[in-house]
């Protein structure tokens, strides 16, 4: 399984049960990067309602996604799925937002290799960085 996450400068993902930010260009970039097909839960699907991509919405998407699927993760703990993940695309907001849920970067950085890094301007962010890691 492959995973896409969005984090701030301190690996924050959520604050008070809500995503920190969203960006139209990032969604387009992520969908294109994933080959136009994404798996996600209903919370994440709300922000993809106007994107032109094939979305599979399931609450248990991390358990049910095929091995080669790209899963856009915002509000699900990834630690129970570490053994299933082969690649991860981290989108960095390059800003600091309030957060109370952090992405477990330390769990990934010890075992993972950075294979690419790309920066691009977003619709609401001056600069977004995509980092792709694999085992």
PLM feature spans:
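Enzymes that bind and transform nitrogen-containing heteroaromatic metabolites
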Residues: 1-135
